[in-house]
Amino acid sequence: MTAEVTAADAEVLLAQPRGFCAGVDRAIDIVERALELHGAPIYVRHEIVHNRYVVEDLRGKGAVFIDELDQAPAGAIVVFSAHGVSQAVRGEAEARGLRVFDATCPLVTKVHIEVARMRAAGREIVMIGHKGHPEVEGTLGQAQGGMYLVETVEDVAALQVSDPGNLAYVTQTTLSVDDAAAVAGALKARFPGIVEPKKSDICYATQNRQDAVKLLAPECDLVLVVGSTNSSNSNRLREVAERKGVAAYLIDGAHAIDPAWLQGRRSIGITAGASAPEVLVQQVVERVRELGAVSVRTMPGLEESVAFPLPKGLSRKIAQTESLE
């Protein structure tokens, strides 16, 4: 042991489930398969998922991350990120002759379909979400007008709509379950006739990881959340732990751990956002062990078995390539 030891004899508790969800797995697979089929460069609009490690790994394999489609040459292969895009972006891609592989999470696509259906029925739509998040921008861009964005209960109180009797609402898929429920409750109280989604828009992985932290936090005196600062669902995990009265930090990886955080801690919880790979979790565990932790235990929890298929166009190309080998 060295003088750096700060978590002497502490136990590490791992949340279950944690880390990659099916939508993130699929999105990364799409970029990697596109690179295998077509070679570099493959252009990706926005970060494929909100994780620095994942983005840098794909960049090293030949992915080029762009903010707007005009940064890709005409006719190039472009991947849309897991967060989804607006109808305007889809139209621009078609107009420029870009070959698109769509990595939009199927659960985000479900919300897009809800928006189209509700607008076709003549309803205005309130979206619960974080302003400026790519998923929110993509969902708001599914309709030309008739949509409103709220983030808080206070936003609901100040909301002015054209037809209060003909409203529906949807939510960003990565919100705090508790916060979204509070805002939805405020919407239903103010607009009693508002139509809600047939099934919650918050995705299974967001729900499961937040539930896991609710079980983890009472057993710990510190929680480390592995995830990037621009990851919505990772930030929500940190907030869930803090609301349970536990100190919590969001970290990109083991290098970000301040040994002082671990001083005197007896039980250190670790989880990871849906866009954070397990390799980063294991590096964090190893670093905490270097700082004095003596045991590692995984909490009981759900074993997820969700998987999403690749886009049909990409699957066909893979099958054609394999048949020629």
UniProtKB/Swiss-Prot annotation:
Pathway: Isoprenoid biosynthesis; dimethylallyl diphosphate biosynthesis; dimethylallyl diphosphate from (2E)-4-hydroxy-3-methylbutenyl diphosphate: step 1/1; Isoprenoid biosynthesis; isopentenyl diphosphate biosynthesis via DXP pathway; isopentenyl diphosphate from 1-deoxy-D-xylulose 5-phosphate: step 6/6
MF GO annotations: 4 iron, 4 sulfur cluster binding; 4-hydroxy-3-methylbut-2-enyl diphosphate reductase activity; metal ion binding
Broad enzyme group: oxidoreductase
Binding residues for dimethylallyl diphosphate: 50, 83, 133, 231-233, 275
Chemical reaction(s) catalysed: isopentenyl diphosphate + 2 oxidized [2Fe-2S]-[ferredoxin] + H2O = (2E)-4-hydroxy-3-methylbut-2-enyl diphosphate + 2 reduced [2Fe-2S]-[ferredoxin] + 2 H(+); dimethylallyl diphosphate + 2 oxidized [2Fe-2S]-[ferredoxin] + H2O = (2E)-4-hydroxy-3-methylbut-2-enyl diphosphate + 2 reduced [2Fe-2S]-[ferredoxin] + 2 H(+)
tRNA processing listed as a keyword: no
Binding-site list for isopentenyl diphosphate: 50, 83, 133, 231-233, 275
Residues annotated for [4Fe-4S] cluster binding in this entry: 21, 105, 203
Transmembrane spans: none
Co-factor binding details: Binds 1 [4Fe-4S] cluster per subunit.
One Gene Ontology biological process: terpenoid biosynthetic process
Pfam families, per the entry: LYTB (PF02401)
Function of the protein: Catalyzes the conversion of 1-hydroxy-2-methyl-2-(E)-butenyl 4-diphosphate (HMBPP) into a mixture of isopentenyl diphosphate (IPP) and dimethylallyl diphosphate (DMAPP). Acts in the terminal step of the DOXP/MEP pathway for isoprenoid precursor biosynthesis.
Keywords for the protein's UniProt record, in alphabetical order: 4Fe-4S, Iron, Iron-sulfur, Isoprene biosynthesis, Metal-binding, Oxidoreductase
Keyword Cell membrane: no
Cofactor entry: [4Fe-4S] cluster
Active site (catalytic residues): 135 (proton donor)
Record's protein name: 4-hydroxy-3-methylbut-2-enyl diphosphate reductase
Source organism per UniProt: Bordetella pertussis (strain Tohama I / ATCC BAA-589 / NCTC 13251)
